[in-house]
Amino acid sequence: MIVDILTLFPEMFSGLESSIVKRAADKQIITIRLHNFRHFSKKKSLQVDDYSYGGGAGMVISVEPLVACLRSIAGYEQAHKILTSPIGPIYKQAKASQLAHYNHLIIICGHYEGIDERILNYVDEVVSIGDFILTGGELVAMMIVDSIVRLLPDALGNNQSLTTESFQERLLEYPQYTRPECFETYRVPEVLMSGDHEKIRQYRRFKALERTYRLRPDLLAEASLTEEDLKWLNKIGRASCR
């Protein structure tokens, strides 16, 4: 996969040079290319923003250098183009799974000042990560890349890790423990040390359902639930009413 990122602050992306993203890049599973669209400004000062038509506070990023930068990317017409902006729908795991199927993504980092509305004519979709304000879309772009890389074949050392992570099955992940067996007054649940794989599976599934029911009940509407799951949820619901 190729991911091109249009930004005014390429230095912010140093975080992608570590951990799983770096390993995926080293294995040529993903190629990330940064483009500073300031270099495509026609002004001597390389200014990329200007006053807003109609007046108002703040400056607006011009569409001209953005589109020029976009068109400089080989294969941009066939690539799936994304703008990060609070006007878009909230980014979720389902969207990450969808984007992971593209061979070429282009992400345009929005800016708190706003971008000329005409940029929407040059992108395929807009995404947001929440109802709050960031200085720019750089952090959003990094989050998108990180979430996608985890879904690419061979990017994770253990593919089972992917299927059991929170949200992948529309459930929060079950609680996990490691050594020591006892820390202060807190012990690892006995069932996890029993060696009984079926009991461990049932325990983990029950705890995932319980955690989701209590913390993120909205996810249950989209989860794939078995008859066993529904019985457990009924039990959890009755216990919550006591």
PLM feature spans:
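An accessory alpha-helical subdomain
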Residues: E190-R201, K207, R211, L220-E228
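Internal, active-site/partner-interface "lid" segment
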Residues: L139, L151-V191
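Structured adenosyl-cofactor binding patch, chiefly the S-adenosyl-L-methionine
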Residues: I115, I119-E165
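Conserved small/polar residues in nucleotide/adenosyl-binding loops
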Residues: A239-R242
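Short, structured active-site "lid" loops
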Residues: V48-C69
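S-adenosyl-L-methionine/SAH cofactor-binding core of RNA-modifying enzymes
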Residues: S62-C109, D116, P153
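Glycine-rich, flexible N-terminal cofactor/catalytic loop recognition
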Residues: M1-H39
